[in-house]
């Protein structure tokens, strides 16, 4: 089992030159928003529907945006916005767009749109590419742990 100490050791072991280190997750001390947003934008303005077409992250536009669960979601096209609006649970990232790996450990961490996985038709985001590597070591197990932890994480 990965402990906080091992997580910190792994993060510090990554070479500093050009490497992306694992952001230290944190336990929620007070109620956190259900959806992670940076600057009021879900997925940092990235189109959530675009992850499902095989192209990976695509920047959304404020021209094609909507409000869902108190957060603004941007889309690359009106068609993607309409698809999301028709079935947001299909396209919205699991764990509210917070880092899925951190959720599996019982913590919250912000995410990067470039650290993502679509698994069994669901979108999972991670804090960075190193967290994604750790997440991919046991996706089904990490999902199970994250789902078990999730009700208590937001506070």
Predicted features and spans:
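C-terminal partner/receptor-binding element of secreted or periplasmic proteins
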Residues: 136-155
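N-terminal secretory signal peptides and thylakoid transit peptides that target proteins
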Residues: 1-18
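Mid-length scaffold segments of soluble, non-membrane domains
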Residues: 73-86, 90-92, 96-98
